Amino acid sequence: MRLSVIIPAYNEEKNIKATLDDIYDYLSKKHVDHEIIVVVDGAKDRTAEVVSEAIKMIPTLKLIDIKENHGKGYVVRRGMLAAQGELRLFTDADNATTIDNLERLLPFIQQGYDVVIGSIGLPGKEGKAGSEPAYRILFGKLGNLFLRIFIISGIHDTQRGFKLFTAKAATAIFPHQKINRWAFDVELLVLARKLGFKIKEVSIKWANNSETSKIKASDYPKFLLRCLKIRWDLVTGKYDLVN
């Protein structure tokens, strides 16, 4: 079964090569048939050039270089729909969740789940390393509670950049995705559930990197408003969903 690893990248020239080496080395040693797709989101640094150079050493690596910035959700969608794998994982360019965490997700695909998401929010589980600013901890907890009550019940952490989809789920969900920036993860999960796909949340190890985080305190109200719009669009039939 072929695996596609999609990596959205914006101004990641300092991190991307080490992440690519780690992913390729791991999958090669495990003899996993795979492709690695980096989708550059209008980066202002040398991210695309670094990936182009890495292709010489990593034969399974592909680059989609988008010249204008559209947002993480947009480039994840581009990568997912360009992928050829029966399984499709998106993961962050800073390697906050290392590829070996895939071993935690795969058993649930074998059990029949269609979407398996990495989480550091499950009760009784501790998967986070590194400190976060106090505002992110507070807003994160309040935001997750809000989401469970009003948007998508039963999911404790929607925001980890480590999500695995079957090809069937990916090709059904991503064409309906409207949100290109923050909150696209929530939209994907809402769409997956509405389309009848089985979702499993699994504890993973995640290392916070404050230097690579692009989230500001002012982003949280926008995030919540976008989530409310997802619910509104779903209720009013603006998503034309047919599984």
Which residue stretches match the model-derived regions?
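Acidic helix N-cap motif at the loop->helix transition within catalytic regions
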Residues: 14-18, 45-54
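Conserved donor nucleotide-binding strand/loop of the catalytic core
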Residues: 34-37, 48-82
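Acceptor/aglycone-binding surface of glycosyltransferases and processive sugar-polymer synthases
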Residues: 66-82, 87, 99-182, 208-215, ...
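A conserved acidic beta->alpha catalytic loop
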Residues: 40-49, 95
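Hydrophobic helical membrane-anchoring modules
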Residues: 1, 145, 150-153, 176-243
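Short, well-formed alpha-helical segments that are part of the catalytic scaffolds
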Residues: 12-27
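Short loop->beta transition adjacent to catalytic acidic/histidine clusters or analogous donor-positioning motifs
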Residues: 1-3, 24-38, 46, 59-62
